[in-house]
């Protein structure tokens, strides 16, 4: 029996209004999926993206929600289910990203990042299974980071959350089979973050073993690939130009474009 997600359902992409999430939304829509675009801070981008898809003949809706504070994740599905029936593809792309290290880590930062980057994907997986139509197959894809395979202590809380989510990907794949497959995609340096300069980003992007890093479109293609290959579950595809093969004692942005002692602000990933 095929484990390809039921195309009678729709795809929900958290953090789908901007950055990597938007690239995945566009690719899914181009592949014929009806897409629910979740956002929190990117309302203007999400609404424009939905209109772009609908203008091209596709189906899209937007869903607002703070994944760090939502009392019921089932409501997120319920709002889209009212028009489309059920969700058969969940992409956990939303991510909180903030610099800290062992000297600056705090309980507040840990709680905030774990709420969005781990608690939300796991609870969304639970509610995804509950609303999946009986007899249908589903797919959950967690967006991770090549850092989980190439550890360094920068962005300490963020790295801990993504490492935990990689483990959760394998655990959920065991727990949710055979009706739901669970996979991960681990991008490398794909978009500028924080205080990194354009020149520094370009240099870092070119420093991988392949001579180039990942593009948003590469991540989106990996997602479509996972949706179409029914025998893949419990594993993570690293899409990074080989960045994870280059051990570093500090995050790559401190090698290219940011002084080691420069302050690094909050940003999206």
Task: Describe the function of each predicted region.
Residues 166, 176-190, 232-239:
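Conserved Rossmann-fold SDR core element
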Residues 10, 17-19:
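Conserved glycine-rich cofactor-binding loop
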Residues 101-102, 109-114, 204:
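Substrate-binding pocket helix/loop in short-chain dehydrogenase/reductase
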Residues 217-239, 244-245:
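C-terminal substrate-recognition "lid" of short-chain dehydrogenase/reductases
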Residues 208-219:
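A conserved structural motif in NAD(P)-dependent oxidoreductases
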Residues 139-177, 189, 243:
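Catalytic loop of short-chain dehydrogenase/reductase
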Residues 93-99, 242:
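Conserved NAD(P)H cofactor-binding loop of Rossmann-fold oxidoreductase domains
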């Amino acid at each position: 029996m095929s484990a390809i997600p039921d195309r009678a359902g729709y795809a929900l992409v958290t953090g789908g209004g901007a950055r990597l999430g938007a690239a995945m939304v566009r690719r899914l829509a181009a592949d014929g999926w009806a897409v629910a675009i979740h956002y929190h801070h990117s309302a203007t981008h999400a609404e424009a993206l939905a209109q772009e898809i609908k203008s091209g003949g596709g189906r899209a809706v937007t869903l607002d929600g703070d994944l760090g504070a939502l009392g019921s994740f089932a409501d997120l599905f319920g709002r889209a289910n009212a028009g489309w029936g059920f969700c058969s593809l969940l992409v956990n792309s939303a991510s909180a990203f903030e610099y800290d290290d062992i000297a600056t880590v705090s309980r507040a930062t840990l709680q905030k990042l774990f709420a969005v980057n781990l608690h939300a994907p796991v609870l969304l997986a639970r509610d995804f299974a509950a609303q999946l139509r009986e007899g249908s197959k589903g797919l959950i894809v967690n967006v991770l980071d090549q850092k989980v395979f190439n550890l360094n202590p920068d962005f300490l809380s963020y790295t801990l959350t993504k490492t935990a989510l990689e483990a959760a990907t394998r655990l959920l794949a065991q727990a949710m089979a055979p009706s739901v497959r669970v996979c991960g995609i681990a991008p490398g340096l794909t978009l500028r973050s924080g205080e990194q300069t354009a020149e520094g980003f370009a240099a870092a992007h070119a420093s991988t073993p392949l001579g180039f890093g990942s593009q948003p479109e590469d991540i989106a293609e990996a997602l479509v690939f996972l949706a179409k290959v029914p025998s893949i579950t419990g594993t993570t595809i690293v899409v990074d130009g080989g960045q994870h093969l280059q051990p570093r004692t500090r995050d790559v942005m401190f090698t290219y474009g940011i002084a080691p002692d420069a302050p690094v602000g909050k940003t999206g990933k």
